C-alpha cells in the first residue's frame, strides 16, 4: 500500500511524501477543497494532466478523492496499489510509484 499523505487537516499547508520502495519523492499540496500532486506527477485517467517525473502538477477534488478511495486509517489516507502502483483509481497515481 502507498501512504499518500495526512489528510487530518485541510488548509493551505504543504507536505511531502514518497511511495514505499520508490527513490523518487512527490509533493502533495492541500488546498481548501483539493489536493495537488506534483514533482513526480501522476499517470492514468485520474490525473490526465500529469506525467511521471516531469514536475507537472494535477489537482483532484478532495470529495472525489475520498469517495474513490474511501478509507482513512489513523488520519492517513491509504491507497492499495493499482495500475501504476499509486492511487489505485483506474491506473492513476500520485507521485512516482
Curated annotation (Swiss-Prot):
Pfam families for the chain: Coiled
Gene Ontology biological process: culmination involved in sorocarp development; slug development involved in sorocarp development; sorocarp development
Disulfide topology: none
Induction line: By exogenous cAMP.
InterPro entries for the chain: HssA/B-like_chaperone, HssA/B-related
Signal peptide: none
Family of this protein: Belongs to the hssA/B family.
UniProt-recorded name of the protein: HssA/B-like protein 27
Originating organism: Dictyostelium discoideum (Social amoeba)
